[in-house]
C-alpha cells in the first residue's frame, strides 16, 4: 500500500563486511576503549605514594639533622666538662700541696736561723750541728723535687704579687720602690707563689746633711722594730 514505509534496499556489500569481522575483534576493541582509565588509577597511586615517601624522607632528614646537632652539642659540653673537671682536680691537688708545704716552711726557716746564728764549740757540738744540717739538706732536696724554689728579692723592684712590704726606709744605695732587705724568704711552687717574701722597701735617698736631728731620729724609729731581728740566711732552696 501507498501508506507503508519503504523497505530498505538489500546491500550485499554491507552484509559481507559484517560477516568478515569476527566477534572476538569487536569484543577486543570494546575492552581497549576502557583500558586507559584502568591503567591511570595505579599510576596515580604510585605518584601519591612517591610524594608521601619524599615527605617522609624530608621529615627524617630534618630529624636526623636535629639529632646530629643535639649530639654534637652534648659531645662538646661533655668534653668541656671533662676538661673543667681535670683543671679542678689539678687546682685542688696544687692547693693541698701548697697548704702542706706552707706548714713545712717555718721548719725550714728555723733550720736557716740555727745555721746562721749557732756557732758550735767543741767536737760534740760540731757533730750535732752537722747532724741537723744533714737533715736540713735532705728537707731542701725534697722541696726542690716538689718544685719549690726560693725568691731572690733584694735589689728587685717591689712587686705586691711577690712581696709583702713590712716597712719603708730611706736608702742611698737603692732607688725608690726597690727591695732593700729580705726579712722572711718567699717561695714559688712551679711558678705559683707559695709564700710572699717579707721585705723592706726603699723610699729613695735619705735626708740631706742639713736635715734636723729630730727628723733623722724619726727615721731611725721607723725601722727600729727590725734592728734586733736576725738577718736572713743565704738561700737554701
UniProtKB/Swiss-Prot annotation:
Subunit comment: Homodimer.
Stored Gene3D superfamilies: 3.90.20.20, Head domain of nucleotide exchange factor GrpE (2.30.22.10)
GO molecular function, one term: protein homodimerization activity
Superkingdom of origin: Bacteria
Name the UniProt record assigns to this protein: Protein GrpE
Localization per Swiss-Prot or TrEMBL: Cytoplasm
Keyword annotations of the record: Chaperone, Cytoplasm, Stress response
Record-stated family: Belongs to the GrpE family.
SUPFAM superfamilies tied to this protein: Coiled-coil domain of nucleotide exchange factor GrpE (SSF58014), Head domain of nucleotide exchange factor GrpE (SSF51064)
Biased composition (Polar residues): 27-40
A Pfam family hit: GrpE
Major location category of this protein: cytoplasm
Region (Disordered) location: 1-52, 200-237
GO BP annotation list: protein folding
Compositionally biased region (Low complexity): 204-218
Gene Ontology cellular-component annotations: cytoplasm
Function recorded in the entry: Participates actively in the response to hyperosmotic and heat shock by preventing the aggregation of stress-denatured proteins, in association with DnaK and GrpE. It is the nucleotide exchange factor for DnaK and may function as a thermosensor. Unfolded proteins bind initially to DnaJ; upon interaction with the DnaJ-bound protein, DnaK hydrolyzes its bound ATP, resulting in the formation of a stable complex. GrpE releases ADP from DnaK; ATP binding to DnaK triggers the release of the substrate protein, thus completing the reaction cycle.
Amino acid at each position: 500500500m501507498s501508506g507503508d514505509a519503504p523497505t530498505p534496499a538489500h546491500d550485499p556489500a554491507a552484509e559481507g563486511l559484517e560477516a568478515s569481522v569476527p566477534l572476538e575483534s569487536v569484543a577486543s576493541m570494546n575492552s581497549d576503549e576502557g583500558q586507559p582509565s584502568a591503567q591511570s588509577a595505579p599510576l596515580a597511586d604510585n605518584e601519591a605514594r612517591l610524594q608521601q615517601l619524599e615527605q617522609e624522607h624530608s621529615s627524617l632528614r630534618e630529624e636526623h639533622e636535629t639529632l646530629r646537632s643535639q649530639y654534637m652539642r652534648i659531645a662538646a659540653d661533655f668534653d668541656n666538662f671533662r676538661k673543667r673537671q681535670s683543671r679542678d682536680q689539678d687546682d685542688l691537688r696544687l692547693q693541698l700541696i701548697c697548704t702542706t708545704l706552707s706548714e713545712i716552711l717555718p721548719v725550714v726557716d728555723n733550720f736557716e736561723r740555727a745555721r746562721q746564728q749557732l756557732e758550735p764549740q767543741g767536737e760534740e757540738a760540731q757533730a750535732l750541728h752537722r747532724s741537723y744540717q744533714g737533715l736540713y739538706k735532705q728537707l731542701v732536696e725534697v722541696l726542690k723535687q716538689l718544685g719549690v724554689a726560693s725568691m731572690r728579692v733584694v735589689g728587685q723592684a717591689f712587686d705586691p704579687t711577690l712581696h709583702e712590704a713590712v716597712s719603708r726606709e730611706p736608702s742611698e744605695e737603692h732607688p725608690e720602690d726597690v727591695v732593700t732587705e729580705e726579712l722572711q724568704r718567699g717561695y714559688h711552687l712551679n711558678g705559683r707563689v707559695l709564700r710572699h717574701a717579707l721585705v723592706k722597701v726603699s723610699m729613695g735617698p735619705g735626708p740631706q746633711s742639713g736635715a734636723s736631728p729630730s727628723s733623722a731620729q724619726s727615721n731611725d724609729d721607723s725601722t727600729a722594730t727590725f734592728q734586733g731581728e736576725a738577718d736572713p740566711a743565704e738561700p737554701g732552696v
